[in-house]
Amino acid sequence: MNKANQLVINYHITEKCNYDCHYCYAKWAKPNELHRNVDEMKRVLSKLAEYFLSPNPIQQQLQYQSVRLNFAGGEPLLLKQRLIDALDFAIELGFETSIITNGHLISDEFIAKHSHKLQLLGVSYDACRYEVQKQIGRITRSGNVLSVERLQSIFKQVKRHSPSTKLKINTVVNQFNSEEDFIGVMASLQPDKWKVLRVLPVFDSIQTISDQQFESFIERHQSLVHCMSAENNDSMTNSYLMLSPDGAFFQNGNGSSGYFKSRPLLTTPIDVALAESGFDAIKFAQRYH
């Protein structure tokens, strides 16, 4: 069954980040980011709403009931009020919303004021040990990391302020954390979903891991199968509907190319840009089954 209850559009709103993860593919050589011109950003979001929230070929194919705009980065919370404004506008247009963040900038105030707006809050978390976080690059310039204790506090507060907001952890299995043990931390966090992704060699500089390393990580965490969703490289390719910071659809490629982009949505009809993007709706649906 190639059906999906919800279509997800991942809007990589900024390339800026307070971390420097070695495997990150969110690098667009500092494009002209759409959010800097609020009117243009609103035009693009409005075009997306007009197309995807009305009958269209993808909707006919997947039979989705709702569309979620997922704000990603870089680190979206670096944009502060500009992110909140984009979030509020997306809700006004009729989107469900979510954020994927490294969690470092989530304040208690942010949770109290805004967590109820989110259908889902995702936190990228690759290691519990400081040394491994440092090797991966999940560390600020001043040497700070997101501790397990702070992550637990974030989850607890979101559950209190917005019980309907689903909580997700994303973990990228890479050369540095393939031996990490997440059983204890997941038992304490109780996420609705733990997405385990194999590091994707989008650029030549990104070190891959072997099938065996990835599979043994999954096997070691079999006790978490009730919340774990594992994605190998093939299932990740062409199965995400992604918008770059400058407002074009893109897909991850491999090697030196990094990614493939459509023309900008500001000046291109959505259906044309969609055809240029290489998005595969069937592969998207398969990730949710």
Which residues make up each language-model segment?
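Radical SAM enzyme [4Fe-4S]-AdoMet core and its adjacent flexible, acidic
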Residues: 33, 129-250, 257-288
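Short glycine/proline-centered loop/turn elements that form peptide/ligand docking sites
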Residues: 101-103, 254-257
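Flexible loop residues that form catalytic
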Residues: 29, 103, 126, 199
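Acidic (Asp/Glu)-rich catalytic clusters
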Residues: 49-53, 113-117, 186-190
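Conserved alpha-helical substructure of the radical SAM core
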Residues: 1-73, 77-98, 106-112
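Short, well-ordered coil/turn segments that N-cap beta-strands
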Residues: 65-67, 93-95, 117-119, 163-165, ...
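Acidic-and-aromatic substrate-binding clefts and catalytic sites of carbohydrate-active enzymes
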Residues: 76-79, 104-108, 173-179, 203
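Hydrophobic faces of well-ordered beta-strands that scaffold small-molecule active sites
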Residues: 9, 69-71, 97-99, 121-123, ...
